[in-house]
Amino acid sequence: MKWEDRLDIGGLSDVGMRRSNNQDSFRILAAPNVEQWRSRGHLFVVADGMGAHAVGELASKMAVDSIAHSYHKLVQLPIPQAIVKAVQDANSLIHNRGTANIEFQGMGTTSTALLLLPEGAMIAHVGDSRAYRVREGRVEQLSFDHSLAWELVRRKQLTLEQARTMVPTNVITRSLGPEG
């Protein structure tokens, strides 16, 4: 990708038909100039909160805000280490908030961050918020869920078809917050 290439950016989150509140959050931080893009890239972060009502909403908002803030402050680190550290910082922040107040106990969120860089893309991923690439009319899943079903398939203990029918699909094995 060249700086002159067109990049259309947008974001939308919808509560859907089954829930009364939306626990999704996202941040889009496009580099303001070519120098910033070459040095740190464009950052896209999504999160899907877990926990009762406002607790999940708060966790997802904390995740996207913290990851974006930390990543751009960690300019002394190489990009791969900076995005990992930013996710770790978000995890600690959410965990500390969850343990400091009984009402926030167990708060957590899934999150996926994508860095779009001159040399390609990089993904940091926790949970079941997926990253996809759409190219030439094809959709390709780039991340795989940290869920019980996917873990069993990855370990070859179940086929994909068995996992879809035998294992609850909403049991995630990794998230930001609950375990620090």
Predicted features along the sequence, with ranges:
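PP2C/PPM-type serine/threonine phosphatase catalytic domain
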Residues: 1-180
